[in-house]
């Protein structure tokens, strides 16, 4: 392990011990807010401190084993112990390096998922519906809660646009690499000559930001329109103007919500989505800067980035960012997304480790 990594780990272990002492102090216990914050930090550092202690013990074990190599009677046993300790040390080093990677504060949060039909007309809208069901099944398999914020149905099925909120621990961290362009190649049901058509949808995944962290929104910058909800997302056709459309005039961002019967609830949801979109726009600027410096699996943040192709005649799904091709399309469409998500997360960790090493 690099000396710079060891130095960081020693500092974190020292901080862990400090926190342990503070948490046993009656003065800290009396201050509930301070106690809560320190407890959270202590819990976050506990795994690193434990693994680093184990790693240090292994280094001492290897030194002891090496000292026994000169003894003919102990040589065989010492060699065996040394090899075993080396393997364990390498495994722990890898784990500790991953734990040292910079954390994205948004990863632990719930998210908003937007799916929009792109090129391909009716077939694109139908595919948007297929993507929505794919994510809904995945969310269900993870015991996440999915809630429709707004939905605009296509004329022949599917959706022109669908916005949902997915709630649960670590949702954004799992789904953030789904943002971008999703392309489908298949024979549409309306195609009489059996020709394969290519259509596209765009997906945007945005973390749900706590109210106190939302970008400042001035009411004078908003235009708020009300209208009657209809169709999916407001399946009950309302006789009152409960649906809300909010336009943020400086940026041109428009958000609609018509899922609730209450205008007040629709407005609250729409404001939440607006804040998430504004936060996402700020993040996109950072991503564009990073993308120009080094490869970034999130791309530039542009919705048109072509990230994935779903080829139905071949039963194939390809993620172009990591050149991953799987002939398991049925599984993917049924919500078994981990076979795509996990390789992306591993690649992302490898990229971060590489960047961390470059900084040293």
UniProtKB/Swiss-Prot annotation:
The modification N5-methylglutamine is found at residue 235. GO terms for molecular function: translation release factor activity, codon specific. Residues 285-311 are annotated as: Disordered. Keywords: Cytoplasm, Methylation, Protein biosynthesis. It is found in: Cytoplasm. Its main location: cytoplasm. It comes from the Bacteria. Belongs to the prokaryotic/mitochondrial release factor family. HAMAP family: Rel_fac_1. Peptide chain release factor 1 directs the termination of translation in response to the peptide chain termination codons UAG and UAA. This is Peptide chain release factor 1. It comes from Hamiltonella defensa subsp. Acyrthosiphon pisum (strain 5AT). The lineage of its organism: Bacteria, Pseudomonadati, Pseudomonadota, Gammaproteobacteria, Enterobacterales.
């Amino acid at each position: 392990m690099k000396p710079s990594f060891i130095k960081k780990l020693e500092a974190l272990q020292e901080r862990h011990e400090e926190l342990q002492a503070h948490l046993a102090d009656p003065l800290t216990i009396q201050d509930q807010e301070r106690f809560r914050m320190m407890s959270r930090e202590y819990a976050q550092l506990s795994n690193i401190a434990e693994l680093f202690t184990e790693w240090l013990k292994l280094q001492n074990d290897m030194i002891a084993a090496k000292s026994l190599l000169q003894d003919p009677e102990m040589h065989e046993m010492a060699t065996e112990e040394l090899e075993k300790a080396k393997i364990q040390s390498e495994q722990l080093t890898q784990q500790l390096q991953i734990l040292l990677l910079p954390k994205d504060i948004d990863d632990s949060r719930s998210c908003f998922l937007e799916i929009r039909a792109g090129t391909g007309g009716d077939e694109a809208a139908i595919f948007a519906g297929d993507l929505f069901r794919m994510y809904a099944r995945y969310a269900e398999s993870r015991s996440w809660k999915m809630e429709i914020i707004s939905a605009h149905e296509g004329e022949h099925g599917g959706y022109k646009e669908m916005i949902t909120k997915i709630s649960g621990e670590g949702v954004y961290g799992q789904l953030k690499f789904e943002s971008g362009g999703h392309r489908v190649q298949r024979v549409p049901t309306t195609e009489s000559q059996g020709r394969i058509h290519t259509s596209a949808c765009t997906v945007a995944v945005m973390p749900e930001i706590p109210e106190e962290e939302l970008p400042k929104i001035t009411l004078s910058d908003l235009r708020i329109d009300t209208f009657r909800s209809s169709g999916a997302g407001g399946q009950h056709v309302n006789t009152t103007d409960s649906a809300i459309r909010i336009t943020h005039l400086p940026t041109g961002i428009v958000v609609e919500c018509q899922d609730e019967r209450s205008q007040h609830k629709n407005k609250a949801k729409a404001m939440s989505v607006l804040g998430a979109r504004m936060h996402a726009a700020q993040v996109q600027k950072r991503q564009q800067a990073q993308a120009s410096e080094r490869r970034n699996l999130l791309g530039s943040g542009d919705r048109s980035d072509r990230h994935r192709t779903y080829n139905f005649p071949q039963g194939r799904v390809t993620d172009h960012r990591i050149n991953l091709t799987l002939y398991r399309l049925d599984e993917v469409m049924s919500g078994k997304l981990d076979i795509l998500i996990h390789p992306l997360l591993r690649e992302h960790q490898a990229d971060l480790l590489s960047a961390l090493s470059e900084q040293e």
